Design a protein with these regions (language model features):
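A well-ordered secondary-structure block
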Residues: 161-163, 168-219, 313-387
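Short, well-ordered surface patches within globular domains
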Residues: 256-315, 361-363
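Extracytoplasmic Gram-positive cell-surface binding/anchoring modules and repeats
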Residues: 60-83, 113-126, 130-139, 180-187, ...
């Protein structure tokens, strides 16, 4: 965001680890399947024939959610073993009580390529229609709620509402489109659509964030300097929402710290999904180690992987009771929200390697706000491990 240009921002990382196709028919903007929209990522549907149980996946355990009744239909986003995944963590088991159907290949291909065109000012109902039910919700720096949407971390969105309308939107969905701009477009393509009257964040070159002050909202386009300077993510923020927090940094609270930790964890897994590697499990034990280091750096005014006692990340993990074969750590400070922190980490090769490494299976994130001249500055720590 605009105010980031005057911040002091730091990043450090440490680790210990080993076709072109064409469509025969033009696709409509909304793909209908028997009168109902076929969502991007949807692979089929289940029709309920007899009462049957729907489960919710809670940390790998299937818990009772509700009983689906005859006549109800549910979208299916994945078919694994004998279970159909309905989105939102909901699961239904294959049985004679349900009928599974799939659309034509043409409809599936069109649904995959259909752009998502949500933008600032769209209604809450349009969000639900396009994205379904949120997976999680967190507090943001403006004091409002951010809802997180994804399908097993694909098509990732984080959306905040103000007066029941979209006030901020972050996405890594390659099908998303705003003002004719999509994820993976180049800087020159961006300039051809919106012009060259923009601000940049980061060093003079390479450019890491391009910010346009549009009539109703601020549009931030994150640039991946390690992928031919293509757009990696988009963040739109309504000026009305920005004005709810005129200060350089948000008012700190334990709730906001926990929210930043949750969002940063979600961003890492969304990134891993984009990069084609398996997502990480959240570990509260590892997160406690990360949290302690962020707090220690903030309270004692230093920024380093080794703390003032000379303990390395690996020492701290061991002291925290974490057993590991591989481990890595990313730290950052000064970024007013997790979006900018994550995208900056991805533009640093050492941090990027930790985030997308197949050597890790678990992640713990810790955030802390420390007193500073302009308010409270956030410190972030990500600890990656493989037991």
């Amino acid at each position: 965001m605009k105010k980031l240009s005057i911040l002091i921002l730091f990043l450090m990382s440490l680790s210990l680890a080993p076709t072109i196709s064409s469509a025969a028919t033009a696709c409509p903007s909304i793909v209908n399947w028997d009168g109902v929209e076929l969502k991007s990522g949807q692979i089929g549907r289940v029709l309920i024939q007899k009462p049957t149980t729907i489960y919710k996946n809670v940390n790998g355990t299937f818990e009772f959610s509700r009983v689906a009744q005859p006549g109800e239909n549910y979208r299916v986003y994945a078919n694994k073993s004998t279970y159909y995944h309905l989105g939102g963590g909901l699961i239904i088991q294959e049985s004679s009580s349900i009928l599974y159907q799939t659309p034509s290949k043409q409809k599936l291909d069109c649904a995959k390529s259909a752009p998502t065109t949500l933008t600032i000012g769209n209604t809450e109902s349009s969000v639900k229609s396009k994205l379904g039910t949120s997976q999680n919700s967190v507090l943001n720096e403006f004091g409002t709620t951010t809802s997180i949407y994804h399908k097993n971390y694909s098509n990732f969105y984080a959306i905040s509402l103000l007066n029941n309308k979209i006030a901020s939107l972050y996405t890594k969905d390659k099908h998303y489109q705003v003002n004719g701009i999509s994820i993976t477009n180049t800087i020159s393509q961006l300039e051809s659509k919106l012009g060259k009257n923009y601000e940049t964040t980061g060093n003079t070159y390479p450019i890491e964030v391009i910010t346009y002050q549009l009539p109703k909202y601020e549009a931030n386009f994150f640039i991946d300097v390690h992928n031919d300077n293509k757009i990696s993510a988009i963040l739109l923020v309504d000026y009305q929402l920005i004005n709810k927090n005129p200060n350089l940094y948000p008012k700190p609270s334990s709730t906001l710290e926990a929210s930043y930790e949750t969002l940063l964890f979600e961003l890492v897994n969304a990134e891993r999904k984009v990069q084609g590697v398996s997502v990480l499990q959240n570990s509260s034990k590892i997160a406690a180690v990360a949290k302690k280091h962020s707090a220690d750096m903030g309270k004692n005014n230093y920024f380093n992987h080794d703390n003032l006692k000379g303990e390395s990340p690996f020492d701290r993990l061991a002291n925290g009771g974490v057993q590991f074969r591989n481990a890595g750590e990313n730290i950052a400070m000064g970024y007013t929200n997790p979006y900018f922190a994550h995208e900056a980490l991805m533009n640093s090769l050492g941090h990027r390697k930790n985030i997308v490494s197949t050597a890790y299976t678990q992640l713990g994130v810790g955030a802390h706000f420390a007193k500073w001249t302009y308010g409270s500055i956030p410190y972030y720590t990500e600890n990656f491990i493989k037991p």
